[in-house]
Amino acid sequence: MKAAVLTLAVLFLTGSQARHFWQQDEPPQSPWDRVKDLATVYVDVLKDSGRDYVSQFEGSTLGKQLNLKLLDNWDSVTSTFSKLREQLGPVTQEFWDNLEKETEGLRQEMSKDLEEVKAKVQPYLDDFQKKWQEEMELYRQKVEPLRAELQEGARQKLHELQEKLSPLGEEMRDRARAHVDALRTHLAPYSDELRQRLAARLEALKENGGARLAEYHAKATEHLSTLSEKAKPALEDLRQGLLPVLESFKVSFLSALEEYTKKLNTQ
């Protein structure tokens, strides 16, 4: 169980390096930056879409009958959640900083493994890219005369042109599939090698560094406990901030329910 927890932590903390290895794009973000960005986007989308849904509900026949005034309280609710996010920000940042610090050595070893495998597979990736560009250029050269023929020909030649293009498209698809299969075959041993290296690292850590692994687990547990304790005041503020909103909702709902019951009794 400890090994599984540590594996997840290491893979998450080295995830940006792995992504950078395969995609070769912009420099990786820190784990906390990725979590923070994801949470911000999620909360913003939830806030915007939630407001739209509430607005649509209040505009419906049922919403008008209930008259719950949910939209009036929406800004208060979103403000409360934004405040909670701001309060938990430094606490969560501290947690990730501590976790990164404790696993720095193991992450460096994993990064070294990734770089070594990257150096081995890079020629295959470059070769695949080169062949793909050559195939696209070959396809363009074959299609170009047909495009000119279409521009110069009449409408009745369109079907004939489509028949000529069909085998070219199938040929292109088959050749591309062959290159992809070849690349997959070349990369398979290195993927296995990387997986075996990770397993070996963790096995060695478990066998020769049991105390170190237990220390990782103990420190992670300690950091989580600290995070929980520091989050309690912010969560209590959230509860206190939501109480008036929930009370207002309850009063509005009961009032609407009572009015609806009276209407049923008078019918």
Curated annotation (Swiss-Prot):
It is found in: Secreted. Residues 1-18 form the signal peptide. Sequence repeats lie at residues 68-89, 90-111, 112-122, 123-144, 145-166, 167-188, 189-210, 211-232, 233-243, 244-267. GO terms for molecular function: amyloid-beta binding; apolipoprotein A-I receptor binding; chemorepellent activity; cholesterol binding; cholesterol transfer activity; enzyme binding; heat shock protein binding; high-density lipoprotein particle binding. Glycosylated. The keyword Signal applies. The keyword Translocase does not apply. Major protein of plasma HDL, also found in chylomicrons. Pfam families: Apolipoprotein. InterPro entries: ApoA_E, Apolipoprotein_A1/A4/E. Residues 68-267 are annotated as: 10 X approximate tandem repeats. The modification Methionine sulfoxide is found at M110, M136. Its main location: secreted. Participates in the reverse transport of cholesterol from tissues to the liver for excretion by promoting cholesterol efflux from tissues and by acting as a cofactor for the lecithin cholesterol acyltransferase (LCAT). As part of the SPAP complex, activates spermatozoa motility. Homodimer. Interacts with APOA1BP and CLU. Component of a sperm activating protein complex (SPAP), consisting of APOA1, an immunoglobulin heavy chain, an immunoglobulin light chain and albumin. Interacts with NDRG1. Interacts with SCGB3A2. Interacts with NAXE and YJEFN3. This is Apolipoprotein A-I. The gene is APOA1.
